[in-house]
Swiss-Prot record:
UniProt region (Disordered), positions on chain: 19-54
Taxonomic lineage: Viruses, Riboviria, Orthornavirae, Kitrinoviricota, Alsuviricetes
SUPFAM superfamilies given in the database record: Positive stranded ssRNA viruses
InterPro entries to which the protein is assigned, alphabetical: Tymo_coat (IPR000574), Viral_coat (IPR029053)
Protein name from the UniProt record: Capsid protein
Origin species: Grapevine fleck virus (isolate Italy/MT48)
GO MF term list: structural molecule activity
Function recorded in the entry: Self-assembles to form a T=3 icosahedral capsid composed of 180 copies of the capsid protein. The capsid encapsulates the single-stranded RNA genome.
CC annotations in GO: T=3 icosahedral viral capsid
Subcellular location: Virion
Family: Belongs to the tymoviruses capsid protein family.
Compositional bias per record (Low complexity), positions renumbered to this chain: 19-48
């Protein structure tokens, strides 16, 4: 059965003026309104890998060292001396000999001491002593201006026991042998005071006391050289 043409055209016009609504035609019907100032979308990324372990120091073999004591006589005092004298510890033959078989050597202790003799009971003596770095040699009049310097007197009514003057290695460079040469190793300077009675004796003046130096050297890294046969 066919509809009249005028009815068919009227139905089509009505559909065009009022299109049917459907929830499926509106993709945002079930979605909440989104504010223009904020977005709910989030970026999801893979978790970061674990941090690598902290670096550690490379294990090194501990340095093997040996402690060698030394002692030597530096100066015999007769009371006829004047002015002053000085000594570099690193260049002293006794110290050089001890450290010769090793590449590295450092002082762990160092001291000078005066050993009186019986003659000092008749001929008392006086000296000024100080420790400095190797590149500093104070004049006789400057010795007591050095921190730690001492004026030492012995004999007669003064005590005759050994008198010590330790070196303060925290203010001096204790390394006496290394791959390089240092100018701040320990140096001992002594200022003398003449005794007129000893001067009158001339060359027959007795030894009234001796200045000795002793200490301990830590030596390491033996030098690879032929082993001596004797």
């Amino acid at each position: 059965m066919s509809l009249p043409a005028d009815l068919l055209l009227g139905a089509i016009s009505s559909l065009l003026r009022n299109p049917p609504t459907s929830d499926a035609a509106s993709p945002s019907a079930d979605q909440p309104a989104v504010s223009s100032s904020r977005s709910d979308s989030r970026l999801v990324s893979a978790p970061l890998p674990a941090a690598p372990p902290a670096p550690t120091a490379i294990a090194r073999n501990p340095r093997v060292s040996i402690h060698l004591p030394f002692q030597f006589l530096w100066y015999d005092i007769t009371g006829t001396e004047s002015s002053y004298t000085s000594l570099s510890i690193a260049s002293r033959p006794e110290v050089v000999t001890v450290a010769r078989p090793y590449r590295h050597a450092r002082l762990t202790s160092l001291e000078a001491f005066v050993q009186p003799t019986a003659s000092s009971a008749t001929y008392p003596q006086t000296v000024d002593l100080c420790w400095t770095i190797d590149s500093v040699t104070p004049a006789r009049s400057e010795i007591l201006s050095v921190f730690g310097a001492q004026r030492i007197a012995w004999g007669s009514v003064h005590f005759s026991a050994p008198i010590l003057l330790p070196a303060e290695l925290s203010s001096l460079n204790p390394t006496i042998k290394d791959s390089v040469t240092y100018t701040d190793c320990p140096r001992l300077t002594c200022g003398f005071y003449r005794n007129d009675a000893c001067v009158a004796l001339g060359s027959s003046a007795p030894i009234c006391g001796s200045i000795l130096i002793r200490g301990v050297i830590e030596c390491s890294a033996p030098i690879n050289r032929p082993t001596p046969s004797s």
